[in-house]
């Protein structure tokens, strides 16, 4: 990409740093995950969790959510000003699961946010460590991406539910910063912009006055983030049009939906990071591993290696399949919800099945679920190989656009074709090429028509043995070219509701 020189790596965004060399980046990312680990250990001590209870992913998620809530400035301020019945704005908590007399019991805990902030800062050398918080948000976002479908959200904004592969990061909070923006899919950005434009259409004062000026700046910033994800000149030019519009309205919504559809074939660059649950970092720190000294990367071998050596448990409902629960969490850990199943299966060394065939619900347990029948099992999070995470859409021929599949946004930099139903996608592009963006639309459609499903992406890139930490011997897998690998095919997952 032409602008590569000005880009910070995503580890730099993650750690809020300016340009650093590779060693400094590895050290600062190590410092970040080490801080998460230290915080987790301290929380387990506070809550008197046994070793087994501390390795329970549901407990990890509760603790992560507590610290995110404790640092959510805007929501805290809102809660102070709008006191609601039964909600103490100064407290945070959630369900903690304990093992008692051979059964799992749920205990609702409540903590002062101030106390949680103190423990977090103490674990992070007295700093706020915003990067670590963002890291936890991205882990939750990746878990949501693997667990829920966003059909309803897509339909509400006028998009097609088959565009789900563009929705990475759709549940990330707004305060997730540059690192959060990097992992958002094209569809997520389009949806945020459409919501904003719709508000402007319905509320005359939305773009006016001092507040309106701030709104406008936010709008243009979001447009620029989305523009940066596109890799073809025509798509970027269309984004300039949307950004510069005097009074954004239905024409802009049309343009954005057009761009989102085009991203099914002319894919955008979306970053992928392996963000693991806090308990995994906690286990490593507890065993004496020094993340800062050893260095850490979210896009290399490190997360794979960490998962090879971590034993994490999960609560299992009576009719759930533990292997399926493991697959769900494995995909979340590697940000692979939108990856081709052929690639995921090869790396994992076990068949990764489409979500419609999974006998498992989400990881979190609702407060009204019966604990009597709950069991727990070990999550199998190990892999056969490792591969480098990608931040490109896998477009071929000089980063022009190439084949995409109705639902793939590649996670791993591994050679494969990206099969897609051209007829299905192109059917959405009939007619409307008039108006001020007509030449760009025509150009985009032309590029899409010339894309071939058999083109190979990530030419020559392969997976690596777990013993090959310097990535010296790529193993280039061969895939059945016709077999498409969409995780969301024939889907029956629950909707994501806040």
Curated annotation (Swiss-Prot):
Transmembrane segments: none annotated. A motif (Unconventional nuclear localization signal) lies at residues 1-18. GO terms for biological process: symbiont entry into host cell; viral penetration into host nucleus. It is found in: Virion; Host nucleus. Keywords: Capsid protein, Helical capsid protein, Host nucleus, Host-virus interaction, Ribonucleoprotein, RNA-binding, Viral nucleoprotein, Viral penetration into host nucleus, Virion, Virus entry into host cell. Late in virus-infected cells, may be cleaved from a 56-kDa protein to a 53-kDa protein by a cellular caspase. This cleavage might be a marker for the onset of apoptosis in infected cells or have a specific function in virus host interaction. InterPro entries: Flu_NP. Residues 1-21 are annotated as: Disordered. One of its GO terms (cellular component) is host cell nucleus. A motif (Bipartite nuclear localization signal) lies at residues 198-216. GO terms for molecular function: RNA binding; structural molecule activity. Encapsidates the negative strand viral RNA, protecting it from nucleases. The encapsidated genomic RNA is termed the ribonucleoprotein (RNP) and serves as template for transcription and replication. The RNP needs to be localized in the host nucleus to start an infectious cycle, but is too large to diffuse through the nuclear pore complex. NP comprises at least 2 nuclear localization signals that are responsible for the active RNP import into the nucleus through cellular importin alpha/beta pathway. Homomultimerizes to form the nucleocapsid. May bind host exportin-1/XPO1. Binds to viral genomic RNA. Protein-RNA contacts are mediated by a combination of electrostatic interactions between positively charged residues and the phosphate backbone and planar interactions between aromatic side chains and bases. Belongs to the influenza viruses nucleoprotein family. HAMAP family: INFV_NCAP. This is Nucleoprotein.
């Amino acid at each position: 990409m032409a602008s590569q020189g000005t880009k910070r790596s995503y580890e730099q965004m993650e750690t809020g740093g300016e340009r650093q060399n590779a060693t400094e980046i590895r050290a600062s990312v190590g410092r970040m995950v080490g801080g998460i680990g230290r915080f987790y250990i301290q929380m387990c001590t506070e809550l008197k969790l046994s070793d087994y209870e501390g390795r329970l992913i549901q407990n990890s998620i509760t603790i992560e959510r507590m610290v995110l809530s404790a640092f959510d400035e805007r929501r805290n301020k809102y809660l102070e000003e709008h006191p609601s019945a039964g909600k103490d704005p100064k407290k945070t908590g959630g369900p903690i699961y304990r093992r008692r007399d051979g059964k799992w019991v749920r205990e609702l805990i409540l903590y002062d946010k101030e106390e949680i902030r103190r423990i977090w800062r103490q674990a992070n050398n007295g700093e706020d460590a915003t990067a670590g918080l963002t890291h936890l948000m991205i882990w939750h976002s990746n878990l949501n991406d693997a667990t829920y479908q966003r059909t309803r959200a897509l339909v509400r904004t006028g998009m097609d539910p088959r565009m789900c592969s563009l929705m990475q990061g759709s549940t990330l909070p707004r305060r997730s910063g540059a690192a959060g923006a990097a992992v958002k899919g094209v569809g997520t950005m389009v949806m945020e912009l459409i919501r904003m434009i719709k508000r402007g259409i319905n509320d005359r004062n939305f773009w006016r006055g001092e507040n309106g000026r701030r709104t406008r700046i936010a709008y243009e910033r979001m447009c620029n983030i989305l523009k940066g994800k596109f890799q073809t000149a025509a798509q970027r030019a269309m984004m300039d049009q949307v950004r510069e519009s005097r009074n954004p309205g239905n024409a802009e919504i049309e343009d954005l939906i057009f761009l989102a559809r085009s991203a099914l074939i002319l894919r955008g660059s979306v970053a992928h990071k392996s963000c693991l649950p806090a308990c995994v970092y906690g286990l490593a720190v507890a065993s004496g591993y020094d993340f800062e000294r050893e260095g850490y990367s979210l896009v290399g071998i490190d997360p794979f290696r960490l998962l090879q050596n971590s034993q994490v448990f999960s609560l299992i409902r009576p009719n759930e399949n533990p292997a399926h629960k493991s697959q769900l969490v494995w995909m979340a850990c590697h940000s692979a919800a939108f990856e081709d199943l052929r690639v995921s299966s090869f790396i994992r060394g076990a068949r990764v099945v489409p979500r419609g065939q999974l006998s498992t619900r989400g990881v979190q347990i609702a407060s009204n679920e019966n604990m009597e029948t709950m069991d727990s099992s070990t999550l199998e999070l190990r892999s056969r190989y490792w591969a480098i995470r990608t931040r490109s859409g896998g477009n071929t021929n000089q980063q022009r656009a190439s084949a995409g599949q109705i639902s793939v946004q590649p996670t791993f930099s591994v050679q494969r074709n990206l099969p897609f139903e051209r007829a299905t996608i192109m059917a959405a592009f009939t007619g409307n090429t008039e108006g001020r963006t007509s030449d760009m639309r025509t150009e985009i459609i032309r590029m899409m028509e010339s894309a071939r499903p058999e083109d190979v992406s990530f030419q020559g890139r392969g997976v690596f043995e777990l013993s090959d930490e310097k990535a010296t011997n790529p193993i280039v897998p061969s895939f059945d070219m016709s077999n498409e690998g969409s995780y969301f095919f024939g889907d029956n997952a629950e909707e994501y509701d806040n």
